[in-house]
Every structure is written in C-alpha cells, then in structure tokens.
Amino acid sequence: MANTASAEKRNRQAQKRRARNVQVRTGVKSAVKKLREAIAKGDPAATQVALKSAEKTIGKAASKGVLHKNAASRKISRLAKAAAKPAAAAK
C-alpha cells in the first residue's frame, strides 16, 4: 500500500500503463494466431495479408515500448520465415 500521495499517483499511473500494455500484447497475440491459422490452411493470399497485419501490430508494439525492438524484429523474422515455408514447398 502506498504511503505518500506521490506513491499513490505512481501506482495509478502504473495500473493505466499496465492495462494499455496488456491490450497491445493481446493484439499482438491475436495477430500472430491469425497468421498461424492462415499458414495452417495453406492459403497464400490470406497468409500474406495476415503477415502484413502481424508485422504492423508487432512494429507498433515495439514503437510504444511494449516489446523490445530486437524481440519484435525476431518475432517478425520468424513469422516471415514460417509464412514463406509453405510457399517454397509448393514450388
């Protein structure tokens, strides 16, 4: 429990930030899930749309500081690699 007014304010601010960060992280998870489902279906057009959406969502999360930029880059790289694998196998 906060003892001072400034500590109470910091607690309120932290709760607001946490709620915002959780929302952003949830969006990232949803975008990644949609991409993985598109990859599993084997639809190249849907996969490309989902990949673009996931990249955008992850990039925004990194720019807001929710994800570290290197972690975001690693996620995007791995997702792009996974999305490219079925396309390469089809050729």
UniProtKB/Swiss-Prot annotation:
What keywords tag this UniProt record?
Ribonucleoprotein, Ribosomal protein, RNA-binding, rRNA-binding
One example GO MF annotation: small ribosomal subunit rRNA binding
Read off the Pfam families from this record.
Answer: Ribosomal_S20p
The Gene Ontology CC terms held by the record are: cytosol; small ribosomal subunit
Is Ribosomal protein among this UniProt entry's keywords?
Answer: yes
Entry-linked Gene3D superfamilies = Ribosomal protein S20
Q: Which InterPro entries match?
A: Ribosomal_bS20, Ribosomal_bS20_sf
PANTHER family, alphabetically?
30S RIBOSOMAL PROTEIN S20, SMALL RIBOSOMAL SUBUNIT PROTEIN BS20C
The entry assigns this protein to a family as follows: Belongs to the bacterial ribosomal protein bS20 family.
Q: Which HAMAP family does this chain map to?
A: Ribosomal_bS20 (MF_00500)
Fetch the NCBIfam families from UniProt.
Answer: S20
Protein function: Binds directly to 16S ribosomal RNA.
Q: What is this protein called?
A: Small ribosomal subunit protein bS20
The species is Anaeromyxobacter sp. (strain K)
Name of the gene this protein is made from: rpsT
